[in-house]
Amino acid sequence: MKILIPTAKEMNTDLPSIEAIPLKPESQTVLDALALYSASQLESFYKVSAEKAAEEFQNIQALKRQTAQHYPALKLFDGLMYRNIKRDKLTEAEQDYLENHVFITSALYGVVPALSPMAPHRLDFLMKLKVAGKTLKSHWKAVYDEALKKEEVIFSLLSSEFETVFSKEIRAKMVTFKFMEDRGGQLKIHSTISKKARGAFLTALIENQVQTVGEARRLNFAGFVYREDLSQPQGLVFVKEV
């Protein structure tokens, strides 16, 4: 069983660094394509300020020169979902579960264990980077599929842009999750609710050592409970009353 989570734009490098591991050939090809951009080209590529583009340029060049600092990916990424994941003070069983079941889908690194070393970078599948004449999605599709082809159960906490990197055969095995708030009988869904809830849900999976869809349905976390009336066999809906 694998649980898939996306990367995040926000990063925290105020952490102890860890040893890097060599980039896979597929990752090196992506890095080589990114490294062709100047700082000013990155400004329009990323749609960011000149200052932010200069910072990203330095990050890319440090990776290229193999001088970049690396951190455990789960702790490096620091978006809203990540800040709601239990990342410290894990029991031995929780640490084992995290290492064996939780994987991050990255447009630079591929599908990797959540605590893999990563360097600060910015890249996602909505970005129009050409890699050896291919889109990022087509560049990664075979590698992404290979990472999951033996899995019977795949929990996806990904957004659709990441899910569509996988083939239909792999996507057919994915169990997806929606998190909603019930405000006086009105069901609301928005990105802030979803991101926080995804982090809290992953924490509940880790703490309860969940291995099956049935076990996931029984979870009660951060005020969210499973709603069978709103769910499908492979699309689980959790609702919080506010």
Swiss-Prot record:
Family note: Belongs to the UPF0246 family.
| Pfam families associated with the record | H2O2_YaaD
One GO term under biological process is:
response to hydroperoxide
Q: How is this protein annotated for GO cellular component?
A: cytosol
Q: What is this protein called?
A: UPF0246 protein SPD_1378
NCBIfam families listed in its UniProt record: PRK02101.1-4
List the PANTHER family hit by this protein, alphabetically. Answer: PEROXIDE STRESS RESISTANCE PROTEIN YAAA (PTHR30283:SF4), PEROXIDE STRESS RESPONSE PROTEIN YAAA (PTHR30283)
